[in-house]
A protein has these predicted regions:
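Structured catalytic core of nucleotide-sugar glycosyltransferases
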Residues: 1-97
Length: 97
């Protein structure tokens, strides 16, 4: 599938913010009518974010998880998301909106 937009969000202990992040991205991208993916890069979270990301990915093919075994930092998470992104355009956003 050709992807127009890749939205990359580094995640570190953002369990409470993930549902709203997903909802808003899905709402905006669906309204735009473009093909898209949401690359969620879990940077060693310890609050359940990892499991939440994996569950979202099971339910929605737009969600692409990238899971780190430990915390490498914000910039490394962004770089990994960029590397995994398949879109013609890549948008970086923070999970806390």
């Amino acid at each position: 599938m050709l992807v127009t937009f890749s939205i990359v969000a580094p995640i570190f202990n953002e369990l409470d913010n993930l549902p709203e992040l997903y909802r808003r991205v899905r709402e905006v991208m669906s309204a735009a009518g473009a093909t898209w993916e949401l690359v969620l890069v879990d940077d060693g979270s310890t609050d359940g974010s990892t499991d939440a990301i994996l569950q979202l990915a099971k339910r929605d093919k737009h969600v692409r998880p990238v899971i780190f075994a430990r915390n490498f930092g914000h910039q490394v998470a962004i770089t990994a998301g960029w590397d995994f992104a398949r879109g013609e355009a890549v948008v970086i956003i923070d999970a806390d909106l």
